[in-house]
Amino acid sequence: MTITPQQLIALLPLLIVGLTVVVVMLCIAWRRNHFINSTLTVIGINLALLSLWFVTQNGPMDVTPLMRVDGFSMFYTGLVLVASLATSTLAYAWLAGYPGNRDEFYLLVLIATMGGILLASANHLAALFLGIELISLPLFGMVGYAFRQKRSLEASIKYTLLSAAAASFLLFGMALVYAQTGQLSFTALGQTLNDTMLTQPVLLAGLGMMVVGLGFKLSLVPFHLWTPDVYQGAPVPVSTFLATASKIAIFAVVMRLFLYAPVTHSDTVRLVLAIIAFASMLFGNLMALSQSNIKRVLGYSSIAHLGYLLVGLIVVQAHTLALETVGVYLAGYLFASLGAFGVVSLMSSTYTGEDADSLYSYRGLFWHKPLLSSVLTVMMLSLAGIPMTLGFIGKFYVIALGVNSHLGWLTGAVVAGSAIGLFYYLRIMVSLYLSPPENLRRDMPSNWALTAGGVVVLISSLLVLLLGLYPQPLITLVQLAYPIL
């Protein structure tokens, strides 16, 4: 097939990130310079973000049988690129004290970003699998990048082994779906699947295995066991990427699959997803109550947040509000997570020391760093879904969608989960304003707000507050980000 200029423009973000990978690789071969390679990475991701404007002017289209570029893919590509940009920026300070080769970290981030962009545009089960592998394989290396530290190496081994098992489930599930339908394209599956076919045991087994594989990647109960350990063991910038870019990209492709293929018309699939959502909301929040490590708290809370999002996934075919709900919620979750992990990253010393991830490290922080404490407070309020933050707008959408779709018990679980969540978010906030311990030494620089990581954290907190007070620009953007049906 011949590729037209319009198709090349549609692929611009992917091509620019791919070109950045090549440039950074050549630069490493020529001369190792941490500052130059990190700058090239940030420039490449910014150019990819700018190229989205040209893609918008180009209009929606099917670029290849595997990829469909439309408003939906552009919105989620933008979110993935923002998460990657924040990860690269936060990683610079952490890598400054790293004794080994630092530059390869940026290559891994860029390759994983390509996987995220591919997932946002995927319109085919082959593209779904390629995208998931392209985002997962670099993450194995990123999670274990601090391999001299036992916990990082342990987290990497856990994630690699469980991820390989989940990928085999996903692939076998796809094979069963293909055996029953003879189709791999999302749109073709939508035309082929009907109510009688959705009762076939082979097809249900295939869909079940796909749910297992995707549930692992999204850390949904009961496939969540790796999440707190990996979040705690991985370097903070990697935990940031894992919690944001990876989850957003995979949820976007699952939304598109469920939107095109009428999978949720099957009562069995709906019931299974509803049980997973219910368990994720309650289990994620209840387990976070007993944690004294902030990275583990954020890990368990991410399980609960993905549980809330499943409400949108269950009714995505029946309700036009579902796409809007998921878009607003994921944007709020992205900025709140970037801010929260950003504060942990700024508080942690460079590679040489331990991450400042125990709640004890944050006790009395307000009396030393009032602005940083205020930022973390805003992020916790947003994650808890308190009014005047972007997190509240997302939570409000989820509850409204649940009520409109007559999902009474799931809506009740969202409210109950949010109430439980408020307790452990408040615990973190209260510790910031207690009297500081005498013998606690903090390594962070006094001018943190002027560092690149500080700018990321401040921008995230401003967006959480401004869009929480006036969410209309985000809602308009999400309404424009509608897939071709």
UniProtKB/Swiss-Prot annotation:
Arranged from A to Z, the UniProt key words for this protein are: Cell inner membrane, Cell membrane, Membrane, NAD, Quinone, Translocase, Transmembrane, Transmembrane helix, Transport, Ubiquinone
On the tree of life, the source organism's domain of life is: Bacteria
Q: Which Gene Ontology cellular component terms are annotated? A: plasma membrane
UniProt organism field:
Sodalis glossinidius (strain morsitans)
Topology with respect to the bilayer: Multi-pass membrane protein
Q: What is this protein called?
A: NADH-quinone oxidoreductase subunit N
- Give one GO biological process term: ATP synthesis coupled electron transport
Q: Give me the segments passing through the membrane.
A: 8-28, 35-55, 75-95, 105-125, 127-147, 159-179, 203-223, 235-255, 271-291, 303-323, 326-346, 371-393, 406-426, 449-469
Primary location: membrane
